[in-house]
């Protein structure tokens, strides 16, 4: 197996490129199936968030992944290759560990990425695109990333892009309590935004979602009025803050819609935060007076502030990554001995059972127990050592001192340096 991590993220690609390869939930099954149709790909999972799209797979031909990604999203291979990275083998494991631990996130140490990776893995398992090769790799990565976060402290007081969004609102509005917030979207990011805003004192929510049931759940938890996406034009003028985080493929809030809302508000300021990739709000909305529009890329400068403690924790986490990587390599190598160990143990167990049953029959027949046990012990030792003894004699005859040293190591013995004197 060759583990490969291939993709692009907020460090390598701007938002207008990332949104073109973002994986829509409705596309997930078909894309995974399409990926597994490639004869070069044995198993695969796809992770897609607002900041990254990554393919994790078992393949000996990683170059096909970029070609496939470009073809599926109708992009030029030459264009996409400028932003794409491919990590193989040990480097692929290291990259994935860094992603799962939050070290590669825009907000260093944010915990959501681990949950998102687990969801991508679980979905691939259900679909059957992750099987015996990738399953133990992912399970190791999940265990290791949890240890890294705990030991480094990088996961202490967890933050996320959603939390950064709330902090940005706090910089522009001094009083959370008086705000009317229009939340569009009911996914994980939207839920986190609602949670943090509610904790800061916001109680006036308008919540719209393509799935009305999901919006109702948020409204029940944090209070507020439940709306459909079609209600946005009517209720947009009531919002001081608009936070949109849907999975729509195209923008649905345009300049004219916001301009109309401003007129209804007598041009009172509006704060719009587009956390979606692809974007929900057209960029030219920012041309309007009294409108403050931000997207996920705009959060980067804010995220950099006040991160000293997390960066210190990240240094420790990087050291732990190297340690976990060494552990993984040793663990992965040990898998090669798994079948040998299993077969050897089964063989020894079978021999022991055969001799035990023979001894029990003799005892049942009235033979002296001490004599039977002595014979049982001798016969068992002879049978267990028969094949190794033949092998040791052969390698001694072949003058393979290296194999004899290995045998001494395996049998934990400090016997003579050679079983037989060299015949000159």
From Swiss-Prot:
Function of the molecule: Catalyzes the NADPH-dependent reduction of glutamyl-tRNA(Glu) to glutamate 1-semialdehyde (GSA).
Annotated positions binding NADP(+): 185-190
GO biological process: protoporphyrinogen IX biosynthetic process from glutamate
Active-site residue numbers: 50 (nucleophile)
Enzyme Commission code: 1.2.1.70
Pathway linked to the protein: Porphyrin-containing compound metabolism; protoporphyrin-IX biosynthesis; 5-aminolevulinate from L-glutamyl-tRNA(Glu): step 1/2
UniProt source species: Legionella pneumophila subsp. pneumophila (strain Philadelphia 1 / ATCC 33152 / DSM 7513)
Record has Oxidoreductase as a keyword: yes
Pfam families documented for this protein: GlutR_dimer, GlutR_N, Shikimate_DH
Family the entry assigns: Belongs to the glutamyl-tRNA reductase family.
Lineage: Bacteria, Pseudomonadati, Pseudomonadota, Gammaproteobacteria, Legionellales
Domain notes: Possesses an unusual extended V-shaped dimeric structure with each monomer consisting of three distinct domains arranged along a curved 'spinal' alpha-helix. The N-terminal catalytic domain specifically recognizes the glutamate moiety of the substrate. The second domain is the NADPH-binding domain, and the third C-terminal domain is responsible for dimerization.
CDD domains, per database record: NAD_bind_Glutamyl_tRNA_reduct (cd05213)
Site (Important for activity): 95
EC category name: oxidoreductase
Catalysed conversion reaction: (S)-4-amino-5-oxopentanoate + tRNA(Glu) + NADP(+) = L-glutamyl-tRNA(Glu) + NADPH + H(+)
Any further remark recorded for this protein: During catalysis, the active site Cys acts as a nucleophile attacking the alpha-carbonyl group of tRNA-bound glutamate with the formation of a thioester intermediate between enzyme and glutamate, and the concomitant release of tRNA(Glu). The thioester intermediate is finally reduced by direct hydride transfer from NADPH, to form the product GSA.
Keywords: NADP, Oxidoreductase, Porphyrin biosynthesis
Binding of substrate, residues: 49-52, 105, 110-112, 116
GO molecular function: glutamyl-tRNA reductase activity; NADP binding
The name this protein goes by in its record: Glutamyl-tRNA reductase
Subunit structure: Homodimer.
